[in-house]
Curated annotation (Swiss-Prot):
This is Creatine kinase S-type, mitochondrial. Belongs to the ATP:guanido phosphotransferase family. It comes from Bos taurus (Bovine). It is an enzyme of class 2 (transferase). Signal peptide: none annotated. Residues 40-64 are annotated as: Cardiolipin-binding. Mitochondrial creatine kinase binds cardiolipin. GO terms for biological process: phosphocreatine biosynthetic process.
Length: 419
């Protein structure tokens, strides 16, 4: 159980706490010296004008590169969050990775909850660009985890092979993974697994530390889509999220392997409900029930998730703000996937396609991973219903093409639930 002292120790005022409690000049001196070194580095940084430090983004194709201007950079360059995170650290992954051939990446991350406020002049336009016009300066994000509102949640299993819903949650008071110290990573792991031990019934399970798994066990879990990949993605490595791997990383799952929690990958936690077949309503019901129970258990231990009414749940990448939810299916659509209207149909249904194994993978045997594009501005119930209605439309199109009938491109969905 995390004590108040433990939370303060990993918070923003550790050096002041040590000095006040008199726990020793050595510890206090180390922390203060670290702060002094960082402050000295920032002062050295200021010797150069912002124009001399501005990144070359002329060949970049990501949201950060599109929104960052010399004026915004000059305004934000020397600002730091309470944990010492800077604008240059936020954007480095987008500077190092110009873009993606199929998916427009965000190009920046947050190092802590405060990053979204301190660097709002850049984060806000990036969020608006990435999230279909959602403006965090004037809009509020809705939350709804009432799975009973879902309709027509059973897919035709001749086409839909598996169903999955995931989200992320961050623990308030600790840095996000790009800025996490080893101590903070271990505290995240401790907070999470201590809470998860309280899950009962069909949610009960156990935790597996990555550092204690064999290579064969890890790869088997990855191949079965239970475990996150090894941190080889440049988007993760350039953001600093692969540091100290596999320290304090792991996976918790129930005994049926239908409810899983990843620890300390891109986010503090990723909560996942999944199963074979096409019963998305059941998957979402378990997701909502499990997520509510995890939050209750964490709150019982004196912690809470990062959340505010503008951005919803706070996560590392701006692409996952709001619900953090991705509801997806593996669906076999050999005829529709070859139709020239396929991409437009997906766009109008607010869906996206990935290969069978996710981003940057091919579709094996005409099986695609289809999921919602949006994360913020719509509730969890709305997003899952969009996926259900959209996938049913795709399956209906596939059946028509099998019969030699024509299909239509549906009208675009209204923005943010507008009628």
């Amino acid at each position: 159980m995390a004590s108040t002292f433990s939370k303060l120790l990993t918070g923003r005022n550790a050096s002041l706490l040590f000095a006040t409690l008199g726990t020793g000049a050595l510890t206090t001196g180390y922390l203060l010296n670290k702060q002094n070194v960082c402050a000295a580095a920032r002062e050295q940084h200021k010797l150069f004008p912002p124009s001399a430090d501005y990144p070359d983004l002329r060949k970049h194709n990501n949201c950060m590169a599109e929104c960052l201007t010399p004026a915004i950079y000059a305004k934000l360059r020397n600002k730091v969050t309470p944990s010492g995170y800077t604008l240059d650290q936020c954007i480095q992954t987008g500077v190092d990775n110009p873009g993606h051939p199929f998916i427009k990446t965000v190009g920046m991350v947050a190092g802590d909850e405060e990053s979204y406020e301190v660097f709002a002049d850049l984060f806000d336009p990036v969020i608006k660009l990435r999230h279909n016009g959602y403006d965090p300066r004037v809009m509020k994000h809705p939350t709804d985890l009432d799975a009973s509102k879902i309709t027509q949640g059973q897919f035709d299993e001749r086409y839909v092979l598996s169903s999955r819903v995931r989200t992320g949650r961050s623990i308030r008071g600790l840095s996000l993974p790009p800025a996490c110290s080893r101590a903070e990573l271990r505290e995240v792991e401790n907070v999470a697994i201590t809470a998860l031990e309280g899950l009962k019934g069909d949610l009960a399970g156990r935790y597996y530390k990555l550092s204690e798994m064999t290579e064969q066990d890890q790869q088997r879990l990855i191949d079965d889509h239970f475990l996150f990949d090894k941190p080889v993605s440049p988007l993760l490595t350039c953001a600093g999220m692969a540091r100290d791997w596999p320290d304090a990383r792991g996976i918790w799952h129930n005994y049926d392997k239908t409810f899983l929690i990843w620890i300390n990958e891109e986010d503090h936690t990723r909560v996942i409900s999944m199963e074979k077949g096409g019963n998305m309503k059941r998957v979402f019901e378990r997701f909502c029930r499990g997520l509510k129970e995890v939050e209750r258990l964490i709150q019982e231990r004196g912690w809470e998730f990062m959340w505010n009414e503008r951005l919803g749940y706070i996560l590392t990448c701006p692409s996952n703000l709001g619900t953090g939810l991705r509801a997806g299916v593996h669906v076999r659509i050999p005829k529709l996937s070859k139709d020239p209207r396929f991409s437009k149909i997906l766009e109008n249904l607010r869906l996206q396609k990935r290969g069978t194994g996710g981003v940057d993978t091919a579709a094996v045997a005409d099986v695609y991973d289809i999921s919602n594009i949006d994360r913020i501005g719509r509730s969890e119930v709305e997003l899952v219903q969009i996926v259900i209605d959209g996938v049913n439309y795709l399956v209906d199109c596939e059946k028509k093409l099998e019969r030699g009938q024509d299909i239509k491109v549906p009208p675009p969905l209204p923005q943010f639930g507008k009628k």
